[in-house]
């Protein structure tokens, strides 16, 4: 038997093993009464970087009417996102309008319909602060905020006025007030406008500590988003770990990170709690890419992180419950109309392949899906896979 044949058979065997395991760990949720956390009062979903490279923009364009449709990109994950009370992603492109040119890397400007597609997929809140937020200058910041709001999305991290910047975004969900704060390490060398530096939240420890103190007064939970770290590195730096501990101790309840474009671990930092107790707060250093055209190792995948909160029976105090995730993969493929991109929830996609329910998934795609599942489970070994309620 030749080497190539042996490799093919080994790959098919790996897919078969993974497919056999998929239903057992994904498709049934255990009785909440048996959970150590109890029934959640709040379930949040967090996705990673939303990027539109040039091939994605071109693929979304309808040549008959020159309109751009990104909704099919997210159709497969829409049911998952709808199981959350609130869903978030990092909008790592600007929406500055067609007159400035729709472009991918290195200076991103996506069609405004991207925001509508994200809203339709189930997202409620987006971060607009990242190293690409000035890719069309100051006016691009304002236009992005305008188009995001028109789509019905809430945003944070970039602002029009000083007053906006000093008023944290607070969203009430199920009677619980959530504050969102966001910061970026860089704007890729593009300077902030003189006298209006407030339009972009830069990653500054003193600024963040002051904002955390303000947000704690306005909300029950504070979610801190940080665009940080080293691109394509699968583990956080010591500096990130130190910052995470500092900010969690200062009042953040949860840290969500992005920028590396690969999944990094989720850690739990021990923090002093009331009544001389100790609790663990999560930091997701990087959720990877939610959608992009990157194809370097590990950049074609990401996770949707689900974080649940429960109410303590005696005190009514909010407490973190289960933290789980669904690995995702960007499927780049051709159908009868040409090139397409779509985000697939990996376990569901593997099950669909096993049952022959997805005509666009071939053996090569199934092999990569199986690899993503194995890679992610190994990298996030302390976390369970999310089970739909």
Predicted region positions:
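Short, Lys/Arg-rich N-terminal segment immediately upstream of the first membrane anchor
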Residues: 1-5
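Acidic, metal/ion-coordinating pockets
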Residues: 6-389
């Amino acid at each position: 038997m030749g080497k190539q044949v042996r490799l093919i058979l080994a790959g098919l065997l790996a897919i078969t093993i993974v497919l056999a395991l998929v239903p057992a760990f994904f498709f049934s949720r255990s009785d909440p009464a048996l959970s150590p956390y109890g029934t959640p009062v709040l379930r949040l979903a967090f996705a990673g970087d939303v990027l539109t490279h040039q091939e994605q923009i071109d693929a979304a364009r309808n040549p008959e009417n020159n309109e751009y449709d990104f909704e099919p990109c997210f159709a497969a994950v829409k049911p998952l996102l709808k199981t959350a009370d609130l869903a978030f992603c990092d909008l790592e492109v600007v929406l500055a309008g067609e007159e400035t040119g729709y472009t991918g890397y290195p200076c991103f400007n996506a069609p405004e319909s991207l925001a509508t597609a994200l809203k339709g997929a189930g997202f409620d809140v987006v971060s607009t602060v990242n190293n690409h937020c000035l890719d069309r200058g100051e006016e691009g910041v304002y236009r992005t905020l305008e188009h995001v709001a028109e789509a019905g999305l809430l945003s944070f991290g970039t602002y029009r006025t000083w007053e906006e910047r000093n008023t944290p975004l607070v969203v009430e969900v199920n009677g619980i007030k959530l504050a969102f704060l966001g910061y970026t390490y860089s704007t890729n060398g593009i300077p902030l406008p003189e006298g209006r530096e407030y339009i972009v939240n830069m990653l500054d420890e003193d600024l963040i500590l002051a904002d955390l103190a303000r947000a704690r007064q306005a909300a029950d939970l504070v979610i801190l988003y940080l665009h940080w770290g080293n691109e394509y590195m699968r583990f956080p730096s010591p500096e990130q770990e130190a910052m995470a501990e500092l900010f969690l101790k200062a009042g953040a309840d949860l840290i969500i990170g992005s920028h590396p474009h690969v999944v990094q671990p989720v850690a739990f930092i021990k923090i002093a709690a009331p009544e001389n107790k100790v609790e663990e707060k999560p930091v997701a250093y990087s959720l990877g890419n939610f959608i992009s055209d990157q194809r370097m190792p590990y950049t074609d995948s990401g996770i949707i992180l689900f974080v649940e909160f429960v109410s303590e029976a005696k005190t009514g105090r909010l407490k973190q419950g289960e933290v789980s995730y669904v690995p995702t993969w960007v499927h780049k493929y051709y159908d009868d109309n040409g090139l397409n991109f779509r985000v697939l929830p990996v376990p569901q996609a593997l099950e669909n392949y096993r049952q022959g329910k997805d005509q666009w998934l071939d053996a090569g795609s199934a092999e990569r899906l199986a690899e993503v599942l194995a890679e992610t489970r190994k990298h996030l070994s302390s976390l369970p896979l999310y089970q739909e309620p």
